């Protein structure tokens, strides 16, 4: 029998997504109304009314491809985060951003650093490009940034840091994150995955997007799937300097955001 695909792809264990409520109801013979879905950290309040109105207005144009460059969304994000629009890359959810980063910056055999007990997609994205994962043991189920910095090797091209961490919920303060960024070599890209940033208490929040001005190797990744209740739309974005966004946009699929 023929064997298709490279070995590193065949070795990937597919991501186990949370089951839809309808599937759980069929599998266990339950009433959908009695099921509460917690598996994927979706917003329990659902889609905001303002978003429903905007989607209804846009429905008439569903026969056409969306704006491939996302002009209006980038303009709004540019104003919100006080960065130029060409510093923004749009993704099909922030999951897309994580994978784009791996494809843009990691060649087969090169290494990627991330923490034990962090988001499963970091390992999948690394395997998908034939990269070598350096998994740094967690401390109290969170990132050990000192150990992660020390684990960077000559062939390391990418580091993933989830803050707050998914799935353990641990959090790293601004001073510790910035101290870590100062230790990372300039040729190693750091993805700061902030999918759950909006859930932080106000006293713990900080505007990491402004660090991008200081660190040319930093990507700040955000999503509309969690706090904004738009998981089904698949919209995420990254903020980085133009030298980084240029490469990410070469890899990004056209029309990747609805």
Where are these regions (language model features)?
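Structural scaffold positions in well-ordered secondary structure
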Residues: 38, 159, 193-195, 221, ...
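Short acidic capping loops at alpha-helix termini that bridge into adjacent secondary structure
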Residues: 33-34, 84-88, 108-111, 155, ...
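PLP-dependent aminotransferase class I/II
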Residues: 48, 69, 217-258
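N-terminal small-domain helix-loop-helix segment of the aminotransferase-like
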Residues: 1-93, 100
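Short hydrophobic alpha-helical segments of the AMP-binding
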Residues: 77, 122, 126, 184
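Active-site pre-lysine segment of PLP-dependent enzymes
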Residues: 127, 145-155, 167-190, 194-225
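PLP-dependent aminotransferase-like
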Residues: 104-161
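Short glycine-rich anion-binding loops that position phosphate/pyrophosphate groups of nucleotides
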Residues: 41-44, 94-95, 119, 163-167, ...
